[in-house]
Amino acid sequence: VVLEDTVTGEKRDLAIEGLFVAIGSDPRVGLVENQVEISDERFIKVDGRTSKTSLPGVFAAGDVIDPTYRQAITAAGSGCVAALDAEHYLSSK
């Protein structure tokens, strides 16, 4: 990979075996925009450490709720939380 210093323009080679490319960090909340509460930063608001949104029976997880870490592993963990919250919600009905 060729790295370029954006200040000096200097280029240098870096030998690597793999590369992760970040393709964006804007949460995509359009699907639920007018149905659940959205923060000013455009993230879906959830109730504390749960995945419960402002609309009963709708749960959110991953990058659309996480303005801090934005990592695949934390998104996967919040997906598990959402699945468990949804299971609990459905079993109580």
Regions found by a protein language model. Give the residues of each.
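Short glycine-/small-residue-rich Rossmann-like dinucleotide-binding loops
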Residues: 5-7, 20, 24-25
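Internal hydrophobic alpha-helix adjacent to the cofactor/substrate pocket in enzyme cavities
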Residues: 73-93
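FAD-site-proximal beta/loop scaffold in flavoenzymes
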Residues: 15, 22-69, 78, 88
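Non-catalytic, surface-exposed connector residues within folded enzymatic/regulatory domains
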Residues: 13-14, 73
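Short, Lys/Arg-enriched charge-dense amphipathic segments
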Residues: 7-9, 36, 71
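Conserved beta-strand-loop-beta-strand element in the redox core of flavoprotein oxidoreductases
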Residues: 1-13
